Amino acid sequence: METFNFNSLNLKKIKTAIDVGCGNGRHLKSLGFRLSNAKIIGIDQSVQEITKLQNEFSEHICKNQNSYEFLMGDVRSIEIEDNSQDLVICSEVLEHVPNFRDVLKECYRILKPGAV
């Protein structure tokens, strides 16, 4: 079940996207069906979830010429370049993170100016 309405966004120009706190990857899968020729990144602190996603997406049928990268790490300190993402998703994460404002600062830091 999706908890985010991707249909409310204009995704045609999205070429880089990250799901901050991606968990089981449900938003990554939705993006995989909606985007083409995009670099899609998932980051989570759970090594189990990241390992599972790496295995699952290596054979994922909704590739649409997308590339996927999965990072294990702290969502309060994301190892992604400043102003590099067209779309940042952070769904059902903030309530689980101490100092959630640090997560919001990171999301803003990696988001391209004028992006979503």
Predicted features by range, described:
Residues 26, 98-102:
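Short N-terminal helix/helix-N-cap motif within the alpha/beta-hydrolase-1
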Residues 1-13, 30:
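Conserved alpha-helix/loop element of class I SAM-dependent methyltransferases that forms part
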Residues 26-76:
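Class I SAM-dependent methyltransferase SAM/SAH-binding core
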Residues 101-116:
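A short glycine-rich, Lys/Arg-flanked "PGG" loop and its adjoining helix->strand segment in the class I
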Residues 92-93:
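Short catalytic micro-motifs in class I SAM-dependent methyltransferases
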Residues 89:
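A conserved beta-strand element that flanks and buttresses the S-adenosyl-L-methionine
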Residues 77-82:
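Short conserved loop adjoining the S-adenosyl-L-methionine
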Residues 14-23:
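Conserved class I S-adenosyl-L-methionine
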